[in-house]
Regions:
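Sec-exported extracytoplasmic/periplasmic mature domains
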Residues: 37-44, 56, 169-184, 255-264, ...
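Surface-exposed, charged secondary-structure patches
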Residues: 62-106, 235-239
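Juxtacatalytic substrate-recognition/specificity segment
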Residues: 145-268
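Secretory targeting and sorting signals
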Residues: 1-22
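Extracytoplasmic
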Residues: 82-84, 104-106, 117, 138, ...
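Short solvent-exposed beta->alpha transition segments
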Residues: 24-33, 37-84
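Short beta-strand edge/turn micro-motifs at domain boundaries
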Residues: 97-141
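Acidic/His/Gly-enriched intrinsically disordered linker/tail segments
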Residues: 218-224, 244-245, 263-333
């Protein structure tokens, strides 16, 4: 073999090794990400025409009233079949004035490519498997602002949502008076159309929440840049309550929001629910109709809850003598 041939062969081998070490970008994934970047910009810019140029536009009208501080997509996977594709996507958004960090939810998008210009467009956008719906997945979102609250409703009148805002605005000062430790002193309330719609937001069967007037969802542990907790109302059960009961429910759930930063995996349910009940009924002249789950016999059913201290149980970390909120989602039954 001549010297020039050896040199050429070595250069070929080097180039092959170098190429093998590179990760080639998926052009379809890159194109889909570009479409979704334009879609996100249209949402934040309230530009329906620009949104429609990226594909199906019905959802734009559903969420147009929601006060958004951030909205973005991240494509995690694309499965292409000819001129169609299915994309796994993370949607991240923040509600202005309430979310310190983004809500992150998984979505499944179906797209198609125009044969004329080769551009991809969104045909459908739905929650991924085992992910809950967002309010705008269920229809047009109406928004009512209170002094200490933001109420988002679907299938509800503005008058009804104003009633929820008024209740929440009374709940926040009542909770702050009982729980003086730092919290945002504002709440987000979601009011869907029905029990089934509530279950859709939570990504769970409706049977799990039948008879539950409301639940509060949020991250445990008090992460600094976390999304705001959501109080999610079951309108079917909530509508059966009287004036006092409705106020107690919102105050009870707001207590969970306020105490969220002190939540740990060791928090007993009776402790978090007992304190929330105490705050809910505190100024009503009434006592809760029944004790929370696993309420200890040694604890009084009236008076200040601090007269009943949690005890340490064998094999578990000590429970707090402050009164933290429950983990994830806990509801107030009718």
């Amino acid at each position: 073999m001549s010297g020039s041939s050896v040199v050429a062969l070595c250069l070929l081998l080097v180039s092959l090794v170098a190429c093998g070490g590179r990760t080639t970008a998926d052009p379809v994934r890159t194109e889909v990400q570009g479409v979704l970047d334009r879609r996100a910009a249209a949402v934040l810019g309230h530009d329906r025409s620009a949104y429609a140029r990226t594909g199906a536009a019905a959802s734009f009208d559903h969420l147009d009233a929601v006060p958004l501080a951030a909205w973005s997509y991240r494509v995690t996977d694309v499965d292409r079949a000819g001129d169609t594709a299915t994309a796994d996507v993370e949607l991240r958004y923040r509600i202005d004035g309430y979310d310190q960090g983004p809500v992150t939810t998984r979505r499944t998008l179906r797209l198609s490519r125009d044969g004329a210009d080769g551009r991809w467009s969104v045909d459908s956008d739905r929650p991924a498997e085992k992910s809950g719906q967002q309010p705008w997945d269920q229809g047009d979102v109406r928004v009512v602002r209170g002094a200490h609250s933001l109420v988002l409703g679907v299938g509800q009148s503005t008058e009804a949502l104003r009633g929820f805002a008024d209740l929440a605005d009374r709940a926040v000062p009542a909770v702050s008076d009982a729980w003086e430790r730092g919290w945002a002193r504002r709440v987000v309330v979601l009011v869907p159309k029905s029990l089934e719609a509530m279950a859709g937001l939570l990504g769970s069967p409706a049977s799990s929440y039948r008879g539950i007037a409301a639940v509060t969802t949020g991250e445990t542990g008090g992460r600094e840049h976390a999304p705001a907790d959501r109080i999610i109302v079951n309108p079917d059960a909530y509508g059966l309550l009287g004036t006092l009961g409705k106020q107690v429910v919102l105050t009870h759930e707001t207590t969970h929001v306020a105490t969220r930063a002190d939540t740990t995996a060791a928090t007993p349910l009776w402790l978090s629910e007992g304190y929330a009940d105490w705050v809910g009924y505190r100024d009503s002249g009434r006592t809760p109709p029944r004790p929370p789950p696993n309420w200890p016999a040694r604890c009084p059913r009236a008076g200040r809850p601090r007269t009943c201290r949690p005890t340490r149980t064998s094999g578990s970390p000590p429970t707090r003598t402050s009164w933290p909120a429950p983990t994830r989602a806990v509801g107030w039954p009718v």
